[in-house]
Amino acid sequence: MGPICVKKHLAAYLPKHVSVVNGEWSVGHNTHNSPLTTHGAVSAAPYGSASILLISYGYIRMLGDEGVKAATEYAILNANYMRARLEGKYDILYTNKNGQCAHEFIVDLRPFKKSAEVEAEDVAKRLIDYGFHAPTMSFPVPGTIMIEPTESEDKAELDRFCDALLSIREEIKLIEEGKSDKKDNALKNAPHTQSVVTADEWKHSYSRQEAAFPLYYVTQNKFWPSVARVNNTHGDRNLICTCEPVESYMAAEA
């Protein structure tokens, strides 16, 4: 998608391309003959996808100078509005001397691991119950979420997201105060699917309403997740094909 820069001693391990040898165009030359080449191409174009640049180009051309400036101003304004609403309840990282951020900001969730055994993943999964896809998690700082509202969201949507995070902070506070169980709580079990909430049996220490409808706005337009909590790390480290055996496809064709 974009340029990747490495130091000289790593150059030999970068992907190569049939049309480029050691940074020079050589049409028709097979770079696998090059002593530095140890890996083949990873994209059709030598330096990534040129078509991706058309999106940025079109965005800039359509907005024009004033439009790009205005969009940037609104993006920074939106980010700082959200930062100001969340400040005091969450620690905000990397602000300037005036306590402000740029177009995005980082919410530090690491203190909650010690105080309530709540991690960034728990907050990310819980946001789904509030109708939001989680923002960037654990980048560039582990145990954090990075929020970038951009210029396109209106104030009502920004408030809705802030309300969700503030509500989650209150849920964490209940755990910190011992009023909610550290193992069996709405964050650790999030997200809650429709089948789980409507099941005949409910063994949790919190109510079904707390699980699925934590704020009023959620009752008006509920997004139901299709799956509950999965072990992301286990899945990444234990890749298992869930396809039918090859023989079954052969039998079907016959």
Language-model-detected regions and their locations in the chain:
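Non-catalytic terminal extensions of PLP-dependent enzymes
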Residues: 27-38, 42, 60-254
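Glycine-rich, flexible loop/turn motifs
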Residues: 10, 14, 43, 133
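Short alpha-helical interface patches
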Residues: 13, 22, 111-113
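PLP-dependent aminotransferase class I/II
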Residues: 44-55
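Active-site PLP attachment segment
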Residues: 1-19
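Acidic, Ala/Val/Gly-enriched low-complexity intrinsically disordered segments
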Residues: 20-27
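Gly/Ser/Thr-rich helix-start
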Residues: 3, 49-51, 65
